[in-house]
């Protein structure tokens, strides 16, 4: 049953920090409801007749597919604009582009590099803008993560989530702050040189003093409910690969780490794509250069009963749908 519905109409969805605990939990409740409706073939055309621009500076599989299917299910018309279709800040300023798109579209999704770009789109377009990923935050991913955790564990409050890997990336930032807002015990486990920015840590601690930042794997994973990792090198950082491999080898998620939690029901999450074998061109290249058949997670863990990564990937669509419906849709 849905909790009391907050009024989110016309709001942009740029980062978790812009929302209260009640609002984030409402997104999850709505996502669960829409997921059930889709499963049962019940129409939910809350965006009937709306036009949505999907702006992608960065390529994507899950984000693009999730937004496209979500738009279609909600009755909206999605228009994909890749980096070759739109020149944000090159031939036309972001401000001018936002004003043009706002005259033609009812909502805008942006996936790219600078967070300032998505903020400018929101400030100048006059329509709801949704952050599909920036270098700073990845809020639609976090909503999917939270829904997946709640589905498998039954709650969020006091759930111990350990993020292991590059603690400075957008996924870690969003999990740290978003998890703290909903009352989770979030722990970031990474070498000190990759700890989150102090401003992000301070922001998370405003919501929950339990936040832990540590380089000690054993300390971090003790009694964990969720182990989460991401790629060791984000898009645009490929030149740092050799350095990151050496730094993060001790933080690989393997069965030894899973067992160290002491929780036989611990779940494993990853925002994907994951480098857990050599079945890709990238995986082959890494193996040839560094002799690694697995990187941030072993194939054993990835394919184990603990892994919920494909539930998590599916939930991108349901949570994105909830965000669009709540901020743009006719929910009466």
Swiss-Prot record:
It is found in: Cytoplasm. Coiled coil: none annotated. Pathway: Amino-acid degradation; L-arginine degradation via ADI pathway; carbamoyl phosphate from L-arginine: step 2/2. Carbamoyl phosphate binds at residues 60-63, 87, 111, 138-141, 271-272, 316. Its EC number is 2.1.3.3. PROSITE patterns: CARBAMOYLTRANSFERASE. Its main location: cytoplasm. It catalyses: carbamoyl phosphate + L-ornithine = L-citrulline + phosphate + H(+). L-ornithine binds at residues 170, 230, 234-235. Keywords: Arginine metabolism, Cytoplasm, Transferase. Reversibly catalyzes the transfer of the carbamoyl group from carbamoyl phosphate (CP) to the N(epsilon) atom of ornithine (ORN) to produce L-citrulline. This is Ornithine carbamoyltransferase, catabolic.
